[in-house]
């Protein structure tokens, strides 16, 4: 089929090293929770700007200019 190279063998050993194994403990859950909270805050700010419940000086939300 194909030739075996040193780089290919190295990448294969790195890629398959953790296959089928579950890390004990919480793993990446705290990081994902933090990212989820940041996304939620961002979406709430966008919703407040859209509903004009968050007023910014010098910034008006007017959809008449949108074509």
Curated annotation (Swiss-Prot):
Entry's Gene Ontology molecular function annotations: phosphate ion binding
Alphabetical GO biological process terms: photosynthesis; protein stabilization
Keywords per UniProt: Membrane, Photosynthesis, Photosystem II, Thylakoid, Transmembrane, Transmembrane helix
Record's GO cellular component terms: photosystem II; plasma membrane-derived thylakoid membrane
Keyword Nuclease: no
UniProt protein name: Photosystem II reaction center protein H
NCBIfam families in UniProt: PRK02624.1 (NF002728)
Key word Cell inner membrane present: no
Classification via PANTHER family: PHOTOSYSTEM II REACTION CENTER PROTEIN H
SUPFAM superfamilies to which the protein is assigned, alphabetical: Photosystem II 10 kDa phosphoprotein PsbH
InterPro entries, sorted: PSII_PsbH, PSII_PsbH_sf
Main subcellular localisation: membrane
One Pfam family from the record: PsbH
Organism: Prochlorococcus marinus (strain SARG / CCMP1375 / SS120)
Topology in membrane: Single-pass membrane protein
Gene symbol of the encoding locus: psbH
Function: One of the components of the core complex of photosystem II (PSII), required for its stability and/or assembly. PSII is a light-driven water:plastoquinone oxidoreductase that uses light energy to abstract electrons from H(2)O, generating O(2) and a proton gradient subsequently used for ATP formation. It consists of a core antenna complex that captures photons, and an electron transfer chain that converts photonic excitation into a charge separation.
Subunit composition and interactions: PSII is composed of 1 copy each of membrane proteins PsbA, PsbB, PsbC, PsbD, PsbE, PsbF, PsbH, PsbI, PsbJ, PsbK, PsbL, PsbM, PsbT, PsbX, PsbY, Psb30/Ycf12, peripheral proteins PsbO, CyanoQ (PsbQ), PsbU, PsbV and a large number of cofactors. It forms dimeric complexes.
Family membership noted in the UniProt record: Belongs to the PsbH family.
Spans through the membrane: 27-47
Location of the protein in the cell: Cellular thylakoid membrane
């Amino acid at each position: 089929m194909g030739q075996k190279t040193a780089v290919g063998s190295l990448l294969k050993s790195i890629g398959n090293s953790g296959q089928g194994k579950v890390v004990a403990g919480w793993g990446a859950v705290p990081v994902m929770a933090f990212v989820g909270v940041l996304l939620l805050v961002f979406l709430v700010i966008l919703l407040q700007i859209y509903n004009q419940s968050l007023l910014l000086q010098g910034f008006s939300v007017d959809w008449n200019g949108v074509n």
